[in-house]
Amino acid sequence: AASDVNKRQQVDREMPIFEQPLGIPSTFKEHAELMYDLWALAFQTDLTRVGTFMMGKEVTGRSYPEIGVSSGHHGVSHHQNDPKQLEALAKINNYHVQMFAYFLDKLQNIPDGDGSLLDHTILLYGTGISDGNLHFHLDLPMVVAGGAAGHLKGGRHLQYHDDTPLTNLY
């Protein structure tokens, strides 16, 4: 069976030894980049082919002073259409997307077979809510990135009818 072959492959390889981190990163950006670096190493060394990373809890009170947002993320998401709150929310969302772009760049620069690790990967980045003010869970913005070893056509923006379930993406 395939699982038997996979087990034999794993036994035949030396596992890399990584040093344990010395402490908790001092900024959220450092933490996110560290998580993405570990994920890239795990993919590169084929320790795993699946991973998840949640940027924060659904009701996180995390503030982002490094980008000029002193209010908590969850509170800002209940913006009540206040332009200042909407601007702060846009800054947070942009900040998170920049961190995801860091990961994409990292994978793009790791050779893998006939391309890059990104060419042979499929990644999903998104959110569980489109309008926190209304607790609106429809029209969720999602990014699908990577080449999936030639099985994914990129460079497109797709918009579906309002009643299309997100599960259709999977």
Which residues fall in each region the model found?
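Ligand-binding pockets and gating/stacking loops
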Residues: 3-170
